[in-house]
Amino acid sequence: MGTEDAIALPNSTLEPRTEAKQRLSSKSHQVSAKVTIPAKEEISSSDDDAHVPVTEIHLKSHEWFGDFITKHEIPRKVFHSSIGFITLYLYTQGINYKNVLWPLIYAFIILFILDLIRLNWPFFNMLYCRTVGALMRKKEIHTYNGVLWYILGLIFSFNFFSKDVTLISLFLLSWSDTAAATIGRKYGHLTPKVARNKSLAGSIAAFTVGVITCWVFYGYFVPAYSYVNKPGEIQWSPETSRLSLNMLSLLGGVVAALSEGIDLFNWDDNFTIPVLSSLFMNAVIKTFKK
């Protein structure tokens, strides 16, 4: 009996010591948790006020409409197309197209500065994207806005080419490119690819809209509003060209398809389409002058 009691006594004395150590360690964990958690909360809240990560930016329009607006880019296409109609209206009102050049340059400078600010200030980038996000692609959150390339292409055309060539290049960018993107996304998988991210279906759409655009502009608007054109502003006319209206329109469709389909140094097509279409259309008209 004495031996058993002697053996039992150490066990009985060790158990309270073990429990005491466990209680002390649990208390130390609780104390450290109480100390560290508020510190993390304070740090994270102060960081959030100063820096908003670009990866946390979400476009409101994409959240509201989900994959539909992301896939079909409805507001962006409406914006692109509307520029063509607005320009056509200004043409009928006799606005001097050369007077548009400086407003385009000012717009480019302002938007470029805004992009520099937003790409270096995440909080401003978040506000900017939530304001005009419906007109942006997701990749443009992290890089320069496509509108910059759009304006730069128009500056090139308005500065170096005649009135009709400049307007045609803008119409092809507004309407042929929109048609190519819409049809290409819908039916492009059914046709062969003609270039990187370019399908035969999209090229056919660009060609068709290009033909219609040239025929309507040169066949109706130029003669109907001839009084708004100064001498030398319109390069093509039936009297000065070996091309008929129908042939010119067909070649205009080819220009639209080529300009939309060519991938030039992986540059943004908002820049390459007006530049290439201006160069091609100008070459076509001058080549067939009488």
Swiss-Prot record:
InterPro entries for this protein: Dgk1-like
Modified-residue entries (Phosphoserine), positions: S44, S45, S46
A GO MF label: CTP-dependent diacylglycerol kinase activity
This protein's UniProt keywords: Calcium, Endoplasmic reticulum, ER-Golgi transport, Glycoprotein, Kinase, Magnesium, Membrane, Nucleus, Phosphoprotein, Transferase, Transmembrane, Transmembrane helix, Transport
GO CC annotations on file: endoplasmic reticulum; endoplasmic reticulum membrane; nuclear membrane
Subcellular location: Endoplasmic reticulum membrane; Nucleus membrane
Residue segments, region Disordered: 1-33
Compositional bias per record (Polar residues), positions renumbered to this chain: 23-33
Catalytic reaction list: a 1,2-diacyl-sn-glycerol + CTP = a 1,2-diacyl-sn-glycero-3-phosphate + CDP + H(+); 1,2-di-(9Z-octadecenoyl)-sn-glycerol + CTP = 1,2-di-(9Z-octadecenoyl)-sn-glycero-3-phosphate + CDP + H(+)
Cofactors named for this entry: Ca(2+); Mg(2+)
Record topological domains on the Cytoplasmic side: 96-103, 162-163, 225-244
Domain of life assignment: Eukaryota
EC number(s) on file: 2.7.1.174
Known glycosylation sites: N11, N197, N270
GO biological process entries: phosphatidic acid biosynthetic process; regulation of isopentenyl diphosphate biosynthetic process, mevalonate pathway; vesicle-mediated transport
PTM notes: CKII-mediated phosphorylation of Ser-45 and Ser-46 regulates its function in the production of PA.
Thylakoid recorded as keyword: no
Lumenal side, ranges: 1-77, 125-140, 185-203, 266-290
Result when mutating K77A: Loss of kinase activity. Not temperature-sensitive for growth. Regular shaped nuclear membrane structure
pH dependence: Optimum pH is 7.0-7.5.
The family this protein is said to belong to: Belongs to the DGK1 family.
Function: CTP-dependent diacylglycerol kinase that catalyzes the phosphorylation of diacylglycerol (DAG) to phosphatidate (PA). Controls phosphatidate levels at the nuclear envelope. Counteracts the activity of PA phosphatase PAH1/SMP2, controlling the levels of PA and DAG for the synthesis of triacylglycerol and membrane phospholipids. May be involved in vesicle trafficking between the endoplasmic reticulum and the Golgi apparatus.
Additional detail: Present with 784 molecules/cell in log phase SD medium. Rescues the lethality of dephosphorylated PAH1/SMP2. Overexpression causes the appearance of phosphatidate-enriched membranes around the nucleus, leading to expansion of the nuclear membrane without proliferation of the cortical endoplasmic reticulum membrane. Deletion restores normal nuclear structure in PAH1/SMP2 deleted cells and returns the level of INO1 mRNA to normal. Deletion does not affect the abnormal levels of phosphatidylinositol and major neutral lipid triacylglycerol seen in the PAH1/SMP2 deletion mutant.
Protein name: CTP-dependent diacylglycerol kinase 1
Originating organism: Saccharomyces cerevisiae (strain ATCC 204508 / S288c)
